[in-house]
Amino acid sequence: MNSISITWNGHSCFTVEKDGFSIVFDPYGPNTVPGLAPLSLTADMVLCSHEHSDHGYTDAVTLKHSGTKNPFSITKIDTWHDPEQGALRGPNRIHILESDGLKIAHMGDIGCPLTREQKDLLKHLDAILIPVGGYYTIDAVQA
């Protein structure tokens, strides 16, 4: 099957699903994102871009332990949450999922320019999940 489902759960939290296998990205904690209800999700895997409570609250996700085979290959790219090489907000990790010729990247709270090598890893994306708020992350022009 060559179909991937992407569901936005609020803030930078997404669920990506293929062939019955689901991955939740960046679950946020209670009261960390104004206006959003607490999360209560179920998935086979959780991936977090960094350890801030609005991106790394893994307690919001119940793992299925279903034994379903992971159809994705996962590439991780270490970046920064700010333009000062992490001095302001620490590290960030980009996750790239690939399956059956489809390629998706979750950028986390990227806050820095990418190197040529990092950009090369992000070529030929079918979907990109990217923040563009401009305060804690890059802005729309930088994106």
Regions inferred by a protein language model and the residue ranges of each:
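Core dinuclear metal-dependent hydrolase active-site scaffold
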Residues: 1-45, 52-54, 64-127, 134-141
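Short phosphate/oxyanion-binding micro-motifs
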Residues: 60
